[in-house]
């Protein structure tokens, strides 16, 4: 066997492996790798827990948003119903007011017509009385006038009673 550089390299390599085994480097490396694996596993578990928590929060907020939207929709619908009711009530009151005012106006018109007819009749009666008075005064004597006056007075009394 030759003691050349390859032999010394092999002996150095074997001594290096023996030294590493003596110092329990593979155990330390294994422990370090196990610790690192445990840390990564814990971080993954924490990340999973946080993700689930975030998903539950998102679901809760979406549920609350849907509830709020439903409540807003019901409020809008109630407001629309109330507005329609108020509009219908206002329309009904306006129609009633217009009907009352129309009836009152018609009543006033009828009263004015009646007053005008009565005034025309009274004026016609006064004119007829005046004309009759003039005709009778010019053509009748005192006894005939007295008889006509008494007859007319009797007719007026009978119509008034």
Curated annotation (Swiss-Prot):
Protein name: ATP synthase subunit b 1
Compartment(s) of residence: Cell inner membrane
Membrane topology: Single-pass membrane protein
Annotated transmembrane regions: 3-23
Subunit and interaction comment: F-type ATPases have 2 components, F(1) - the catalytic core - and F(0) - the membrane proton channel. F(1) has five subunits: alpha(3), beta(3), gamma(1), delta(1), epsilon(1). F(0) has three main subunits: a(1), b(2) and c(10-14). The alpha and beta chains form an alternating ring which encloses part of the gamma chain. F(1) is attached to F(0) by a central stalk formed by the gamma and epsilon chains, while a peripheral stalk is formed by the delta and b chains.
Lineage: Bacteria, Pseudomonadati, Pseudomonadota, Alphaproteobacteria, Hyphomicrobiales
Keyword ATP-binding in annotation: no
Keyword vocabulary terms for this entry: ATP synthesis, Cell inner membrane, Cell membrane, CF(0), Hydrogen ion transport, Ion transport, Membrane, Transmembrane, Transmembrane helix, Transport
GO annotations of cellular component type: plasma membrane; proton-transporting ATP synthase complex
Similarity annotation: Belongs to the ATPase B chain family.
Gene Ontology molecular function: proton-transporting ATP synthase activity, rotational mechanism; proton-transporting ATPase activity, rotational mechanism
Organism: Sinorhizobium medicae (strain WSM419) (Ensifer medicae)
Functional description taken from the UniProt entry: F(1)F(0) ATP synthase produces ATP from ADP in the presence of a proton or sodium gradient. F-type ATPases consist of two structural domains, F(1) containing the extramembraneous catalytic core and F(0) containing the membrane proton channel, linked together by a central stalk and a peripheral stalk. During catalysis, ATP synthesis in the catalytic domain of F(1) is coupled via a rotary mechanism of the central stalk subunits to proton translocation.
């Amino acid at each position: 066997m030759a003691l050349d550089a390859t032999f010394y390299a092999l002996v150095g390599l074997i001594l290096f492996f023996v030294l590493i085994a003596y110092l329990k480097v593979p155990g330390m490396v294994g422990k370090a790798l196990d610790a690192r694996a445990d840390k990564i596993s814990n971080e993954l578990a924490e990340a999973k827990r946080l993700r689930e928590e975030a998903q539950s929060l998102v679901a809760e907020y979406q549920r609350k948003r849907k509830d709020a939207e439903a409540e807003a929709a019901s409020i809008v619908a109630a407001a629309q119903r109330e507005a329609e009711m108020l509009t219908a009530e206002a329309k009904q009151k306006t129609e009633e007011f217009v009907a009352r005012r129309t009836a009152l106006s018609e009543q006033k018109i009828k009263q004015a017509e009646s007053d005008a007819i009565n005034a025309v009749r009274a004026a016609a009666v006064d004119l007829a009385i005046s004309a009759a008075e003039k005709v009778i005064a010019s053509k009748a004597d005192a006894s005939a006038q007295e008889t006509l006056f008494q007859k007319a007075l009797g007719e007026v009394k009978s119509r008034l009673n």
